[in-house]
From Swiss-Prot:
GO molecular function, one term: glycosyltransferase activity
Natural source organism: Arabidopsis thaliana
Gene Ontology CC: one annotated term: Golgi membrane
EC nos: 2.4.-.-
Protein name: Probable glycosyltransferase At5g20260
EC class name: transferase
Record keywords, A-Z: Cell wall biogenesis/degradation, Glycoprotein, Glycosyltransferase, Golgi apparatus, Membrane, Signal-anchor, Transferase, Transmembrane, Transmembrane helix
UniProt topological domain (Cytoplasmic) ranges: 1-5
Database matches in InterPro entries: Exostosin (IPR004263), Exostosin_GT47 (IPR040911)
Length: 466
C-alpha cells in the first residue's frame, strides 16, 4: 500500500516537473539577447537600408542568430542606463520609419549635405539614420592591452584604414567615443591584426594562425571576465576593424565564441564566411606617407579620357592571371599592363581612362576601387564573391560595372556596348559618391570613417538587448 502511494505521488509530480521545464526554457529564450530580431526590416521596407545583392549573393539585413555562448551566461543586470540606450534606439528606428513614410528628414541642426539620387538605396532612410547616429551613437574602446599589438594600427599603405579608424576613435576628440562603457551602444576590440602579423610573424616562417588566434582570444577572455558587456550580448555589439588578409580568420579561433562578433573587414569574401547580415565591408585604401588617400579629381568629362579602360598591376590571384592572359599589352583601347615604365604615372593614366578595371587579387578587395572613384573613373568590378563596401546604403549597380571572371575575354565588348549617355550618367554618379570614399581627420559627416561607423550603427539598430 505504501509502495502504491509512493508510485502515485511520483506520477503526480510529472506534470509539475514538465511545467517547470517549459517555464525554464521560456525564460532562457526571452532572457537571451534578441539577435535575430529583424529590427531594421521591421521599421524600414526591404528596399531601403537592406544590403544590396552582391554579384553572387542576395543579402538580407539581420544579425546572425545565437542562443548559446561559450562564455558564462549574461548576468541579470538591467540598469537604467541600458534602458535609456534601448529606448533611444527605438526612437531612432521610429524616426527612420517616419522619414521613409513622409520622404523628408528631421534634424535639430542645419544639414550641410542631403543625400539624394539613385546611388542610394533609400536616401531618406539613410539620411535620417545618419542624423540619428550623429546625435546618439557612442563607442567604448576597451583600455586593456598595450601597443603595438593593441590600440595602434598602420596609418599608411593598404592596411591604413585600420590604424586611421583606431587613432580617430582613441584620440579622445571623436564625438562618438564614449566617456564610460555604460553609455556605449557598441564596443571596439582595439586589436590590430596587421600589427600582430607584422611583429609576431617576423621572420615569416609559418602561415599558421595560431599566434593570431591566441592574442585575440586572450583579449576577449580578459574583457569578457572583467566586464559584463561581452556576455550580455554574446559579443553581438562588439566589433573589430582590419584590412589585413588574415583578419577574417580571427573568428576561426573559436567559431562558437565569435559567431556574433561584428567583423569590419576589407576582405569581404562571401565564399569564405563573410556574412553581410552581421559583418561590415569597408573599402581598401592605399594611403601614401604624408597624405590621407589617393589624388582626387572632382570634375572631368569623358572627352578628356581617351583610354576606354585601364589596369596596371601584378599577376596576383587567378582573376588577375586571366585578365593579363587575355589583355596584357594587346589592345590600345583596353590598356592592361603588368608593370608600368618608370616615366608613366599610374594615377594620371587612371584619370585619362573612362573605365578603371578593378580585379580581385589574392583577396577580393582592391584599393583601385577607391582610387578610381576619387579620380572620376567608373570602376569595373571584376570579382566573383565580393560584398561591396557600404552596400547597406549604396546601390553599386548605379555607378559601377560588374564583370564576372568568366566574362573577362568579353570586357571590350561589354564596355563598348555602353552608350555615351549611359557612361556620362555613371560618371556623374561616381563623382556624387566621392565624399563617402575620402578620409578626413578629424572625420566629417558622410566621409569614409563616418560610413564605417554608420555600418556598425545599423547593425546595432538591428539588435535588441534585454
Amino acid at each position: 500500500m505504501e509502495q502504491s502511494n509512493f508510485v502515485n505521488m511520483k506520477l503526480s509530480l510529472v506534470p509539475t516537473l514538465l511545467l517547470l521545464l517549459v517555464l525554464l526554457v521560456f525564460y532562457q529564450h526571452h532572457s537571451s539577447p534578441n539577435l535575430n530580431s529583424n529590427a531594421l526590416s521591421s521599421f524600414v521596407d526591404a528596399t531601403s537600408l537592406a544590403p544590396s545583392p552582391s554579384p553572387s549573393l542576395s543579402m538580407e539585413f539581420s544579425v546572425a542568430s545565437s542562443n548559446l555562448s561559450t562564455i558564462s551566461s549574461p548576468p541579470e543586470n538591467k540598469g537604467n542606463k541600458r534602458n535609456i540606450i534601448e529606448e533611444g534606439l527605438a526612437k531612432s528606428r521610429s524616426a527612420i520609419r517616419e522619414a521613409v513614410r513622409l520622404k523628408k528628414f528631421v534634424s535639430d541642426k542645419e544639414e550641410t549635405f542631403v543625400p539624394r539620387g539613385a546611388v542610394y538605396r533609400n536616401a531618406f532612410a539613410f539620411h535620417q539614420s545618419h542624423i540619428e547616429m550623429e546625435k546618439k551613437f557612442k563607442v567604448w574602446v576597451y583600455r586593456e592591452g598595450e601597443t603595438p599589438l593593441v590600440h595602434m594600427g598602420p596609418m599608411n599603405n593598404i592596411y591604413s584604414i585600420e590604424g586611421q579608424f583606431m587613432d580617430e576613435i582613441e584620440t579622445g576628440m571623436s564625438p562618438f567615443a564614449a566617456n564610460n562603457p555604460e553609455e556605449a551602444h557598441a564596443f571596439l576590440l582595439p586589436v590590430s591584426v596587421a600589427n600582430i602579423v607584422h611583429y609576431l610573424y617576423r621572420p615569416l616562417v609559418t602561415y599558421s594562425r595560431e599566434q593570431l588566434h591566441k592574442v585575440f582570444l586572450d583579449y576577449v577572455d580578459v574583457v569578457a571576465h572583467k566586464y559584463p558587456y561581452w556576455n550580455r550580448s554574446l559579443g553581438a555589439d562588439h566589433f573589430y576593424v582590419s584590412c589585413h588578409d588574415w583578419a577574417p580568420d580571427v573568428s576561426g579561433s573559436n567559431p562558437e565564441l565569435m559567431k556574433n562578433l561584428i567583423r569590419v573587414l576589407c576582405n569581404a569574401n562571401t565564399s569564405e564566411g563573410f556574412m553581410p547580415q552581421r559583418d561590415v565591408s569597408i573599402p581598401e585604401i592605399n594611403i601614401p606617407g604624408g597624405h590621407l588617400g589617393p589624388p582626387r579629381l572632382s570634375r572631368s568629362s569623358g572627352h578628356d579620357r581617351p583610354i576606354l579602360a585601364f589596369f596596371a598591376g601584378g599577376s596576383h590571384g587567378y582573376i588577375r592571371r586571366i585578365l593579363l592572359q587575355h589583355w596584357k599589352d594587346k589592345d590600345e583601347e583596353v590598356q592592361v599592363h603588368e608593370y608600368l615604365a618608370k616615366n608613366k604615372d599610374y594615377f594620371k593614366l587612371m584619370a585619362t581612362a573612362r573605365f578603371c578595371l578593378c580585379p580581385s587579387g589574392y583577396e577580393v578587395a582592391s584599393p583601385r576601387v577607391v582610387a578610381a572613384i576619387n579620380l572620376g573613373c567608373v570602376p569595373v568590378i571584376i570579382s566573383d564573391h565580393y560584398a561591396l563596401p557600404f552596400s547597406d546604403v549604396l546601390d553599386w549597380t548605379k555607378f559601377t560595372i560588374h564583370v564576372p571572371s568568366k566574362k573577362i575575354p568579353e570586357i571590350k565588348t561589354i564596355l563598348k556596348s555602353i552608350s555615351w549617355r549611359r557612361y556620362r550618367v555613371l560618371q556623374r554618379r561616381v563623382l556624387q559618391v566621392q565624399r563617402h570614399f575620402v578620409i578626413n581627420r578629424p572625420s566629417q559627416p558622410f566621409d569614409m570613417l563616418r560610413m564605417l561607423l554608420h555600418s556598425v550603427w545599423l547593425r546595432r539598430l538591428n539588435l535588441r538587448l534585454p
